[in-house]
Structure formats: C-alpha cells, structure tokens
Regions:
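Expand to "…catalyze enediolate/carbanion chemistry for C-C bond making/breaking, isomerization
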Residues: 1-272
Length: 272
C-alpha cells in the first residue's frame, strides 16, 4: 500500500474525489481537517461510506478523533461495519492505543490494521513499546505536530526532522512494522514533493500520506513498485485467504507483514 489519501469526512465532494482517485488507501478524516461542530456529521458520512457497495474494491481506513468525539462511540459504530482499520492520531504511548482498541472485538482486531500516528516527542521516545505492546504492523509519522512539540518549524528544521525520521524508520523496520511517511501540505510545488518522496523512500518508508489527489501519481510511481513476482503474489493471496478462513488476519512473508490492506493491494495487482 503506497498512498494514503486524507479527505475531510464532513465534505461530500472531497469524499467523492477520494473514492474516485487512484489512492491505494482512502483516509476519511475526523480529526484536524474537521471542525468540532462537524465531527458527528463526518462520522455519519464515514458510516455511509462503509455501508456503500460502491467502495467494495477500495481500502478505507478512517482517522478517528481522540480529543472531541467520544472514542467508544466512534469505534463501536465503525466496527459494526465491514472496515479495514483505523488511524489513531497523536499516539504518545502504548496506553493511547489501548484506549482505542479496547472497544474492538478481538476477532476483528486480528484482521484489521490499527495504525498509530506518531507526532510528538513522547511518541517518538515510546515508539518501540507502542509497537511491541500492541502488536502493531503499520505505523505512521507526522511532522507538523511534531514540529510544534519540539517548538520548531518542521519545514525550516528539515535536517532535524530527517534525523528523527531515520530513527523512526529504523525502530519500525527492526520490529517488522511498516512505516508510513508524513503528509506534505504544500500542494503547489510538485517538483519539491517528488524530491521529498524520493528521499522518503530512500530512508526506508514504505508509503506516504497525501492531502490532495494531485500528489497520488507521484507517490504511487515512487513507492508502488511491487517487491513480489507473480508467483509470489498468487502464493500470498492464497495463503492469506486460507489463514483468514481460520480466523488469522496477518502472517509474515520475507520479513514483511501481510495484512488485509496488503492482500487487497496484491489482489488488485493480480487482477489487473
């Protein structure tokens, strides 16, 4: 899974644009991009998306809100439906994850991607325990709130951010956890965005967030080279389906975690 596209969950036009885009994962957002007064409306829109037959071939992983909306309300409503995972914002420690996953049925928890978004000093310092204590397979980095946490401009202090990114990637990959890189809010300078994507991949990131559909082709072109040949893809698909029927939602292949989003992505490659 190479590109994760954020879209405000309270604005139908942006949701439709995301669904019709070539994002490998769509992230309807309930956090920063949605005013508090619109969050319940956004939650209703996410539930309607997950109920819709038109998104059956799409991977939908909402980012929930942990500062305004009731966590149990969001998680209980979303997990009643067919969903692929959740992104948890501003995860500072292992308890931040447990405060969310305690509302997810264990059998479902084993089949979905719970993705902590690390965007603070505490989150970086507690990264290994966050991954290990919660069996996390995919984890995300956010530079903008991290910059606020460090009292720096994350764009101006790019060398420091790159240093932290390298530590983030190393700690993640050493624990067989897939790292996703931060979004870039400058959507006008495409050449700069491409350069950032190339650097990101060279650091070891496996995917990147997008905030606009125009960023997707660049992300997909740079990150979306499959490391598996056709025979391996068929093997992975068959093994995932067999294990899934037995109630197992992930397995390890060539030092990589195969979960539902990876399975759906490889299924799309094999079918294309």
């Amino acid at each position: 899974m190479s590109s994760y596209l954020f879209c405000p969950s309270n604005i139908q036009k942006y949701i439709d644009n995301a669904i019709n885009s070539n994002a490998t994962v769509i992230v309807p957002d309930l956090e920063d991009s949605v005013p508090d007064s619109e969050k319940l409306n956004g939650l209703d829109n996410i539930l309607n998306i997950l109920k819709s037959d038109s998104i059956k071939n799409k991977t939908i992983i909402p980012r929930i809100d942990t500062s305004y909306l009731d966590i149990e309300l969001q998680v209980s409503k979303i997990t009643e439906l067919d969903f692929h995972g959740l992104i948890i914002p501003d995860v500072k420690n292992t308890q931040s994850v447990k405060n969310v996953i305690k509302y997810i049925n264990k059998s479902k928890l084993e089949k979905i991607s719970v993705i902590p978004l690390i965007e603070s000093i505490d989150g970086i310092n507690n990264l290994k325990s966050i991954i290990q204590d919660n069996n996390i397979n995919t984890i995300a980095f956010g530079k903008y709130d991290l910059g606020l946490s460090l009292r720096i401009d994350s764009e101006e202090a790019d060398k420091l951010i790159d240093y932290i990114k390298l530590r983030f990637v190393y700690d993640s990959l050493s624990l067989s956890c897939i790292p996703i890189d931060t979004p870039e809010l400058n959507i006008n300078n495409i050449n700069l965005f491409k350069e950032k994507c190339i650097i990101s991949k060279s650091m070891g990131f496996k995917a990147k967030f997008a905030v606009h559909p125009t960023q997707l082709d660049i992300i997909n072109d740079i990150f979306n080279t499959s490391e598996y040949n056709k025979d391996e893809i068929i093997f992975i698909i068959n093994k995932f389906e067999k294990l899934s029927a037995e109630g197992i939602g992930t397995f390890k292949y060539k030092n990589n975690i195969i979960d539902l989003p990876i399975y759906k992505h490889l299924k799309n490659i094999y079918g294309s």
